[in-house]
Structure formats: structure tokens, C-alpha cells
């Protein structure tokens, strides 16, 4: 589907409504700086608070702006298999290139339940499906063995966004899934684990940081893929303060504050999320200046 950097793009709001004008500027910023994919309406896109009509407007506008230049992947996960399928079919109808399907949260399915969830959806769509494993938010962890079973059996499940920060799991996730199917892709779901996942044989990152620093995140991956390990490590180390600052409060609170400081969007979120504290805004201002982004 893509190799490198997929930006998990924010959803801008203004006076409580979608701000498509600011959104277009942000999408073009991503395209101009060489990102390899856009992930719309994921965690960073505040998908739980975007209604069905807004989803359609946002996905349609994204596809218009991108115009086939890079893949557009739409977040479509819920904790109901049938509701998830409905969102998948909406994305399919609109012309998305793929869907990001988070593991069902709160109801805590077993590993067999996880497998059956993805099997059910994969049998009912032709879209490429990306499994999203983020145990810190969902309360359930996709084991590497389960992911390998999915990779072996479900051919339109194209890869996994691995947001378990455990280095051992990352290594086993890449190893076992690629043994099961050589073209199965593994992307980091944590910006600060991107370099380590690449070293383990992974394929890139679905990134929050690239909202504000797309050029630098693209460089981190591109240098690694070109065999320039030291340069990739250097970029990773330079980005560490920004990676840390963008997660001092719950994502996407800090990244929206950062994009506001950069002049891209209003610093507006939907409840239950609230804007960043003054302390966080000041931290972000300093880190952005030190990173040459302000």
C-alpha cells in the first residue's frame, strides 16, 4: 500500500464545524513535503466525534485534493464488527484506497475474536485493510502470532499499524508476519519507535509528528531505505524532542496546538478533548523554534 510515512492527519474545526479551508492547506503541506500516504479519521483525526455526513465530506475532499498522488486510507474501526463494516463500505463507496481498522476496544475480544473480526470484514470488502494495534487505548493486544495468522489467511489485510511500544513485540511482529507473507507490511504506530521498527525490517510509520514535520519524518525513512543508517539515526535523534513534546498530553491535543502555532489551523477540539494547557503550548513553542519549524 505504501512504504515510508503515512500522516495520521488531524481534523481541523472552526466554530464547532469542519474547517475544510484549513484542512486543504494542511493536506497540500503534506503533499509538498513528500509523505507517502494520508490516514484520515484515525485517532489523530478525532474520529469518535465526527459524524457520518462529516466523514463523507472530509474523505471526499481529501480524495479531490490528493487526486491519486498518494494512497488515502480511512479510519473505520469501532468495537462492533457490523458497525465497522458499515464504515468500511462507506469508505469503499467514496473511493478510498484502504481502511485502518482498530482492534475492538472496551469489549476486549480474545485472540480468536480478533481474528474472526478481521476475517468477517475482509470477506466483505475489496479494500486493503490495515490492522491497528494500540493496546494502550483499546485494552487488547494483537499478538504477533495472531497477526501472522491474519497475514497468512486474509489476503486483503495488507499490513498492521503496530502501536505497542514494546521492542520485543515489534521485532516479533515484523519477523512472524513477514514469514507468514512476505508482502505483509508493518508500520510503527509510535513516532519514537519508527527507527527501531525500520531496523527490525518494518516498512515505515503512520505518523503524528509528520503533521508538523513531514519533511523530516520522510527523510528519516528515506535515508534508512537508501542504506544511510547513520543519517537516519541522526534525523531520529534530532526529532526526539519534538516526538516527546507532541505526546505530553493526549494525542491530538498537542499536535493541534503545534499546528495552530504554525498558522495552519484553529486550536479547536471536540469534547471530551480540550485544548492544550498554557504550559504545553509554551513547551511546543520552544521545541518548534529549536526544530526550525517556527
Curated annotation (Swiss-Prot):
Pathway: Amino-acid biosynthesis; L-lysine biosynthesis via DAP pathway; (S)-tetrahydrodipicolinate from L-aspartate: step 3/4. One of its GO terms (biological process) is diaminopimelate biosynthetic process. It holds the Pfam family DHDPS. InterPro entries: Aldolase_TIM (IPR013785), DapA (IPR005263), DapA-like (IPR002220), Schiff_base-form_aldolases_AS (IPR020625), Schiff_base-form_aldolases_CS (IPR020624). It catalyses: L-aspartate 4-semialdehyde + pyruvate = (2S,4S)-4-hydroxy-2,3,4,5-tetrahydrodipicolinate + H2O + H(+). The record marks 43, 106 as: Part of a proton relay during catalysis. Transmembrane segments: none annotated. Its EC number is 4.3.3.7. Pyruvate binds at residues 44, 206. The active site is at 132 (proton donor/acceptor), 161 (schiff-base intermediate with substrate). CDD domains: DHDPS (cd00950). SMART domains: DHDPS. It is found in: Cytoplasm. It is an enzyme of class 4 (lyase). GO terms for molecular function: 4-hydroxy-tetrahydrodipicolinate synthase activity. Keywords: Amino-acid biosynthesis, Cytoplasm, Diaminopimelate biosynthesis, Lyase, Lysine biosynthesis, Schiff base. NCBIfam families: dapA (TIGR00674). Catalyzes the condensation of (S)-aspartate-beta-semialdehyde [(S)-ASA] and pyruvate to 4-hydroxy-tetrahydrodipicolinate (HTPA). PANTHER family: 4-HYDROXY-2-OXOGLUTARATE ALDOLASE, MITOCHONDRIAL, DIHYDRODIPICOLINATE SYNTHASE. Belongs to the DapA family. Homotetramer; dimer of dimers. This is 4-hydroxy-tetrahydrodipicolinate synthase.
Amino acid at each position: 500500500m505504501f512504504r515510508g510515512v503515512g500522516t495520521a492527519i488531524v481534523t481541523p474545526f472552526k466554530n464547532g464545524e469542519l474547517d475544510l479551508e484549513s484542512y486543504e492547506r494542511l493536506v497540500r503541506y503534506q503533499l509538498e513535503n513528500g509523505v507517502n500516504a494520508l490516514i484520515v479519521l484515525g485517532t489523530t483525526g478525532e474520529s469518535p466525534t465526527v459524524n457520518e455526513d462529516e466523514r463523507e465530506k472530509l474523505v471526499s475532499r481529501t480524495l479531490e485534493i490528493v487526486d491519486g498522488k498518494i494512497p488515502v486510507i480511512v479510519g473505520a474501526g469501532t468495537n462492533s464488527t457490523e458497525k465497522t463494516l458499515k464504515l468500511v463500505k462507506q469508505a469503499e463507496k467514496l473511493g478510498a484506497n484502504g481502511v485502518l481498522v482498530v482492534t475492538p476496544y472496551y469489549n476486549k475480544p480474545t485472540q480468536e475474536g480478533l481474528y474472526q473480526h478481521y476475517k468477517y470484514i475482509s470477506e466483505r470488502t475489496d479494500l486493503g485493510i490495515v490492522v491497528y494495534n494500540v493496546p494502550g487505548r483499546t485494552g487488547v493486544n494483537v499478538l504477533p502470532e495472531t497477526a501472522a495468522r491474519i497475514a497468512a489467511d486474509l489476503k486483503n489485510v495488507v499490513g498492521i499499524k503496530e502501536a505497542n511500544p514494546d521492542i520485543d513485540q515489534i521485532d516479533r511482529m515484523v519477523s512472524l508476519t513477514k514469514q507468514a507473507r512476505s508482502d505483509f507490511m508493518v508500520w510503527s504506530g509510535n513516532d519514537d519507535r519508527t527507527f527501531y521498527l525500520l531496523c527490525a525490517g518494518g516498512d515505515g510509520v503512520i505518523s503524528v509528528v509528520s503533521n508538523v514535520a513531514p519533511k523530516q519524518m520522510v527523510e528519516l525513512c528515506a535515508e534508512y531505505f537508501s542504506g544511510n543508517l547513520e543519517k537516519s539515526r541522526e534525523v531520529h535523534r534530532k526529532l526526539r524532542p519534538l516526538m516527546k513534546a507532541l505526546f505530553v498530553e493526549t494525542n491530538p491535543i498537542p499536535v493541534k496546538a503545534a499546528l495552530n502555532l504554525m498558522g495552519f489551523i484553529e486550536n479547536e477540539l471536540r469534547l471530551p478533548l480540550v485544548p492544550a494547557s498554557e504550559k504545553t503550548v509554551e513547551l511546543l513553542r520552544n521545541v518548534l523554534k529549536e526544530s526550525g519549524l517556527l
